[in-house]
Amino acid sequence: MKTPVHVAVTGAAGQIAYSLLFRIAVGDLFGPHQPVILKLLDVPSAERVLEGVAMELDDCASPLLQEIEVSSDPAEVFDGAEAVFMLGATPRGPGMERRDLLQVNADIFSAQGRALNESASRRVKILVVGNPANTNALIAQRNAPDLAPGCFSAMTRLDHNRATSLLARHCGCNVAEISRVVIWGNHSPTQYPDLHHARVKGKPALSLVDPAWYVETFIPTVQQRGASVIAIRGKSSAASAANAALDHMRSWFLGTPKDDWVSMTVSSDGSYGIAEGLMFSFPVTIENGRFRIVQDLPLDTFSRERLRLTEVELLEERAMVSHLL
């Protein structure tokens, strides 16, 4: 049997984790022949819930799940971790301003960044899902100076999947026939879902859809999808977020298809004029576990304005937590 992959999950007593952990345990992340060790982290007050989740994981009797560890100590959970899902974050409460939310989560992610720096594998792949994900990832990265910036990412794969599904439904085709969708920027309503490079059955997507539908329906629908789910379901996206997290990490480990890319929040290298070091969603290709930002995509004035809008929001968020960077 192969050497098991150490997978750490924060916020492991939460709803996204509940939709994620069992799929990892049965091979949906690394495939049917790769064993895993699951290392689960949550706050001490969630200890009983976490123990119950561990019991259920045991009861699945998955031959791939070699070991389960439960702890409230980040250093212990991150020790030797090769894949980290950072799901845990403080949700926005009544009367809480964005600055307040950023500050509360900044404290969490700075501490966890230091723990990752001390104990995680030097080749670790870290996915931040807990919101505000882009800036939380930036905080964790800056507090882990001994890890390469490329070890850190944040999730816009859910937005990418939402955009892909919406375009497929509109065009009456299967999602497998959609390629080259891009989500630029922040995981927030300022994100830019871009179809200028997308393909539907190999044809340019914008040649098949009404420009007014693209601007007036497609873009705001993707931007506001999370809020729409909350309004109808009464709770935030959990199963779809877990699925997107699996997709993101699977692509990172196993690579992207030929002639296609995925959307992934990574540290900007200055591509497309985005401020260096900002955690920003770009189209990326992945090979041998390493991502590369897709270069030289033409951007019209409309697209450049949208990129600038979401970049400004991220710069504002960064300024609010600058004392922790």
UniProtKB/Swiss-Prot annotation:
Disulfide bonds: none annotated. Gene3D superfamilies: Lactate dehydrogenase/glycoside hydrolase, family 4, C-terminal, NAD(P)-binding Rossmann-like Domain. NAD(+) binds at residues 11-17, 105, 112, 129-131. Keywords: NAD, Oxidoreductase, Tricarboxylic acid cycle. The keyword NAD applies. The keyword Oxidoreductase applies. One of its GO terms (biological process) is malate metabolic process. Transmembrane segments: none annotated. It is an enzyme of class 1 (oxidoreductase). It catalyses: (S)-malate + NAD(+) = oxaloacetate + NADH + H(+). The active site is at 187 (proton acceptor). Substrate binds at residues 92, 98, 131, 162. Its EC number is 1.1.1.37. Catalyzes the reversible oxidation of malate to oxaloacetate. Belongs to the LDH/MDH superfamily. MDH type 2 family. PANTHER family: MALATE DEHYDROGENASE. This is Malate dehydrogenase. It comes from Methylococcus capsulatus (strain ATCC 33009 / NCIMB 11132 / Bath).
